[in-house]
Amino acid sequence: MARGPKKHLKRLNAPKAWMLDKLGGVYAPRPSTGPHKLRECLPLVIFLRNRLKYALTGNEVLKIVKQRLIKVDGKVRTDPTYPAGFMDVVSIEKTNELFRLIYDVKGRFTIHRITPEEAKYKLCKVKRVATGPKNVPYLVTHDGRTIRYPDPLIKVNDSIQLDIATTKIMDFIKFESGNLCMITGGRNLGRVGTIVSRERHPGSFDIVHIKDSTGHTFATRLNNVFIIGKGTKAYISLPRGKGIRLTIAEERDKRIAAKVAAQ
């Protein structure tokens, strides 16, 4: 009989987005409890050691974070297994580096460097809108934030632009056709496109049809769609590839063309 929370995570059971090698040991770092789900986060130890190569071992990561050098969304984090997740801004003041955790078209967390201007805000998806005690309206975002007295026009599935320093809502983007979105789950993870239509299925999952800038169309569940811009203008900078996934044939043609150009 299980007693209490699990404390370990086997390497083979770790999310594929972490890109851990199969033979690098038995275990993977189990993320602490926090604002993002275990399968949708990237622990700081993997970000600093495996991605940025700032440390060789977990012990070195511990020494880095205990010096209070790493900030996530403007707050110092000293837990090496702190779960940073989609849209979080990771800042390292000692090296003047700013990153936003975002998916590439292969569905992996990519190292996406951003400008100091862009690091002042983040986008949050609205998960719930409700009324609390004394009829105070509030909303809950995808990263576990509760914001009181939001604009009454903000509804579930919309995105808000949040000022990280003040945690105030700067702007919001409605979930509607023609707006730019990124896919945060499923087989189309990391793709970017504009919403074409939404199929309602009461009692089941609503399906959203999306078209990317090359004209490819695909469909996904509503809860995998994260609005990132009005019209075709994105509120955040996108990683290399701009969220456009090429087919295998298109990737091959691109490689051949690059090889010919290099000769």
UniProtKB/Swiss-Prot annotation:
Source taxon at top rank: Eukaryota
GO biological process, alphabetically ordered: translation
Residues annotated as domain S4 RNA-binding: 42-104
Any one GO MF annotation of this record: rRNA binding
Cystine pairings recorded for this chain: none
Family, per entry: Belongs to the eukaryotic ribosomal protein eS4 family.
Protein name as it appears in the record: Small ribosomal subunit protein eS4
Gene: RpS4
